Curated annotation (Swiss-Prot):
SUPFAM superfamilies: F-box domain. It comes from Arabidopsis thaliana (Mouse-ear cress). Keywords: Gibberellin signaling pathway, Nucleus, Ubl conjugation pathway. Essential component of the SCF-type E3 ligase complex, SCF(GID2), a complex that positively regulates the gibberellin signaling pathway. Upon gibberellin treatment, the SCF(GID2) complex mediates the ubiquitination and subsequent degradation of DELLA proteins (GAI, RGA and RGL2), some repressors of the gibberellin pathway, leading to activate the pathway. The lineage of its organism: Eukaryota, Viridiplantae, Streptophyta, Embryophyta, Tracheophyta. InterPro entries: F-box-like_dom_sf, F-box_dom, SNE/GID2. Changing E138K: In gar2-1/sly1-d; gain of function allele that promotes plant growth by increasing the affinity with DELLA protein substrates. Residues 29-75 form the F-box domain. This is F-box protein GID2.
Length: 151
């Protein structure tokens, strides 16, 4: 004997259908953040410090990978050609002092920020305009002008 369909059964089927769609969408979204740690490491070793720091917010695996001292060492030493000591010696000193991530966040990152534009006060502005007008006045040639006649 077949069971008769009721309105609640139809509503339940529609609800199940939307749940299936949501689950499949979630699975698609989760796929990118579940990359292999080695693959994530290979990608992250080519990014800048800001991108590396932001990537740690993607997932737990990405966070763990972004905390890797080897990645921060690459970022810190990327632009240093010759620092006067060997790579292993540098690594041992920096790791003893807290690591490359700490070195970057406390010392290198503040230096890499552009300085804010200097704002002139009234005195500086007046002095600059005065010097400009003096230079302009000196460059004027008065020899070509006739002198005013005195009466």
């Amino acid at each position: 004997m077949k069971r008769s369909t009721t309105d609640s059964d139809l509503a339940g089927d529609a609800h199940n259908e939307t749940n299936k769609k949501m689950k499949s969408t979630e699975e698609e979204e989760i796929g990118f953040s579940n990359l292999d740690e080695n693959l994530v490491y290979e990608v992250l070793k080519h990014v800048d410090a800001k991108t590396l720091a932001m990537s740690s917010c993607v997932s737990k695996i990405w966070h763990k990978t972004a905390q890797d001292e080897r990645l921060w060492e690459l970022i810190c030493t990327r632009h240093w050609t010759n620092i006067g000591c060997g790579q292993n010696q540098l690594r041992s000193v920096v790791l003893a002092l807290g690591g490359f991530r700490r070195l970057h966040s406390l010392y290198l990152w503040p230096l890499s920020k552009p300085n804010p534009r200097a704002r002139f006060g009234k005195d500086e502005l007046k002095l600059t305009l005065s010097l400009l007008s003096i230079r302009y006045y000196e460059k004027m040639s008065f020899t070509k002008r006739p002198l005013p006649e005195s009466k």
